[in-house]
């Protein structure tokens, strides 16, 4: 044991927490490293593809043991299974008998004192625990609210599916939270929302905020800068994110089609770079619009962030704390974000970042920054200072030992 009274830890997460290069993996990776400071950690997780599986060695270097299962469940089949079993589709999509068996074996064979489940779809792998073992449920975001938002005003079968998922998933989340010793969310706003819909107390539902790797995401760090050809000569606006994720897709579509024409009226050479892996066909099609570039996966996002005149985060549906916003601010870049993308981040609007209520205002605020270099520089400097002051991972995860120890 590394800490008095704490045995070993079982950590369950829906994607292998390596490498920390997308939102869900960034949090799970840093949480895992914090848990490893407390006690030996056994990790059960899924791999989306061969690239995920290739990081098994890195995971093995820090875990006491591991179980990585390739995930190939069909969304259609998972949806049908969920309907048949009364499960949320999200849970059915990650169900696997091998993971259930492995969890039971680890609990029987090892002196596990705490089980940490990361994201709602891993909660169903946690059985009823023996007295004295703690169950910490890190929901991260209130996923049911996201599906409810998808379904609002949406007609046809897809609208029905999303509304049904929102209802069933919320019931599941509430049942899990009742069973867990404590449930955590990425921001106090998310935690407060869940307390309101579940009726649970602050002792049962708490905030566990995201952080940012300040040495890595730093304007002074060593990284490859964009070439002059990549950078171009005009104003560069950048969005970063996983580009097969619906909120990101909708965000860049809106900015490219509505905000960019207004910006290019004033700056005909302005470019909008959509930076992130797995762009869908709809995202790739945006590259046909004037001034829009779709990069796909890049080796190091910091080069694009450092080159950006403005980083934009025009999300309309957003839960919790957006890593993309923290990273841009840590790089000292001026950020224009929607209210949804900035919600939950402990900053002052107009001092640390600019916040827009619609696509037209996003364009206006970008143009304001492009016209006032001093304002842009001051905003970036204040953004970096706020990240250093408030969002170092060591500070945001400082309460984890108490959650594990009870």
Please place each PLM-identified region on the residue numbering.
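Acceptor-binding helix/loop patch of EC 2.4 sugar-transfer enzymes
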Residues: 14, 73-93, 133-174, 192
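Nucleotide-activated donor-binding/catalytic signature segment of Leloir-type glycosyltransferases, i.e.
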Residues: 65, 267-303
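Acidic anion/phosphate-binding donor-loop and adjacent secondary structure
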Residues: 148-149, 195, 212-228
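Acidic donor-binding loop of glycosyltransferase active sites
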Residues: 181, 291, 306-320, 331-334
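Carbohydrate-associated surface elements
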Residues: 189, 208-211
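Short hydrophobic beta-strand element within catalytic cores of glycosyltransferases
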Residues: 324-327, 334-338
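Conserved acidic donor-binding segment of nucleotide-sugar-dependent glycosyltransferases
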Residues: 353-360, 368-374
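A short, well-ordered alpha-helix in the C-terminal region of glycosyltransferases
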Residues: 375-389, 399
């Amino acid at each position: 044991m590394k800490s008095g009274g704490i045995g070993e830890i079982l950590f369950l997460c829906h994607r292998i927490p390596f490498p920390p290069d997308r939102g869900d993996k960034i949090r799970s990776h840093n949480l895992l490293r914090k848990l490893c400071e407390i006690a030996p950690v056994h990790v059960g997780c899924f791999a989306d593809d061969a690239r995920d599986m290739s990081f098994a060695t890195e995971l093995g270097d820090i875990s006491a043991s591991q179980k990585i299962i390739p995930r190939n469940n069909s969304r259609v089949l998972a949806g049908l299974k969920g309907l048949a079993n009364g499960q949320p589709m999200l849970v059915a999509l990650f169900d696997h008998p091998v993971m259930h068996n492995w969890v039971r074996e680890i609990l029987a064979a090892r002196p596990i004192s705490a089980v940490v489940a990361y994201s709602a779809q891993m909660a169903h792998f946690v059985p009823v625990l023996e007295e004295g073992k703690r169950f910490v449920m890190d929901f991260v975001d209130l996923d049911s609210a996201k599906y409810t938002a998808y379904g609002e005003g949406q007609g046809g079968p897809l609208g029905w599916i999303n509304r049904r998922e929102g209802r069933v998933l919320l019931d599941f989340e509430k049942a899990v939270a009742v069973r867990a010793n404590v449930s955590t969310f990425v921001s106090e706003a998310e935690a407060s929302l869940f307390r309101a819909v579940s009726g649970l107390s602050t002792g049962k539902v708490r905030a566990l905020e995201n952080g940012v790797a300040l040495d890595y995401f730093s304007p002074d760090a060593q990284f490859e800068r964009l070439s002059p050809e990549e950078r171009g000569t005009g104003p560069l606006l950048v969005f970063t994110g996983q580009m097969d994720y619906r909120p990101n897709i909708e965000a860049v579509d809106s900015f490219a089609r509505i905000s960019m024409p207004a910006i290019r009226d004033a700056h005909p050479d302005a470019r909008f770079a959509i930076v992130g892996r797995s762009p869908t066909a709809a995202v790739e099609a945006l590259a046909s619009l004037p001034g829009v570039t779709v990069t796909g996966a890049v080796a190091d996002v910091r080069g694009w962030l450092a080159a950006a005149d403005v980083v934009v985060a025009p999300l309309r549906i957003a839960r919790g704390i957006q890593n993309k916003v923290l990273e841009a601010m840590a790089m000292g870049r001026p950020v224009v974000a929607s209210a949804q993308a900035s919600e939950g981040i402990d900053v002052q609007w107009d001092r640390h970042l600019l916040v827009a209520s619609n696509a037209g205002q996003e364009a206006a605020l970008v143009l304001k920054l492009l016209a006032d270099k001093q304002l842009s520089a001051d905003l970036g400097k204040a953004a970096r200072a706020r990240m250093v002051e408030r969002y170092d991972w060591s500070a945001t995860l400082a309460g984890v030992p108490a959650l594990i120890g009870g």
